[in-house]
Swiss-Prot record:
Pfam families in the cross-refs: RecR_C, RecR_HhH, RecR_ZnF, Toprim_4
Gene from which the chain derives: recR
SUPFAM superfamilies: Recombination protein RecR
Source organism per UniProt: Bacillus anthracis
Residues covered by the Toprim domain: 80-175
Name used for this protein in its record: Recombination protein RecR
Membership in a protein family: Belongs to the RecR family.
Keywords: DNA damage, DNA recombination, DNA repair, Metal-binding, Zinc, Zinc-finger
């Protein structure tokens, strides 16, 4: 379908977002065209401000509008426990629990030989420097339970073994309320491995 150039550019811009295919991009473009001009300007301003005003924390790598971020600056946090996650959105997910009281380290990716991403391409060197400079007693590896996340966790655990720092991995398994029949083999296997005495 041929669209006027401004609509085509808008559709192309939406398609650059993850999970947005051609049909959704067209829907979003026409939705924006139907919005009030003030709302469109507010939306555009929010995008520009987020890109301009946010950066990565120099300590943990989490996204923030101040450096260091609010978590690294919180004196009530247990600085001796560092939870290593892949992305800033993982920090947000962990914080929703309101149970974890340690600090974080965001890798901003995972090792992926097929994708050409090695340890030096993610935030691992900064993690090692941080662990050398600070009095960390435990590192919790909370990378995703996929091939890349597992490879990253394994790589970090091997790097840290000689340091004497306790390295743990979050448990993986069945979601609460989930049925066994809908779980895949890997999930069931991880659930069995992570079983504990009751």
């Amino acid at each position: 379908m041929h669209y006027p150039e401004p609509i085509s550019k808008l559709i192309d811009s939406f398609m650059k977002l993850p999970g947005i295919g051609p049909k959704t991009a067209v829907r979003l473009a026409f939705f924006v065209l139907d919005m009030k001009e003030d709302d469109v300007l507010g939306f555009a301003k929010a995008l520009v401000n987020a890109k301009r005003d946010l950066a990565y924390c120099s300590v943990c790598g989490h996204i923030t509008d101040r450096d260091p971020c609010y978590i690294c600056n919180d004196s009530h946090r247990d600085q001796s426990v560092v939870c290593v996650v892949q992305e800033p959105k993982d920090v947000i997910a962990m914080e929703k629990m309101k149970e974890y009281q340690g600090v974080y380290h965001v890798l901003r990716g995972a090792i992926s030989p097929m994708g050409g991403i090695g340890p030096e391409d993610i935030n691992i060197p900064q993690l090692l420097k941080r662990l050398h400079d600070e009095t960390v007693q435990e590192v919790i590896l909370a990378t995703n339970p996929n091939i890349e996340g597992e490879a990253t966790a394994m790589y970090i655990s091997r790097l840290l073994k000689p340091t004497g720092i306790k390295v743990t991995r979050i448990a993986h398994g069945l979601p609460v309320g989930g049925d066994l029949e809908y779980a895949d083999e890997v999930t069931l296997s991880k659930a069995l491995e992570g079983r504990r005495e009751v």
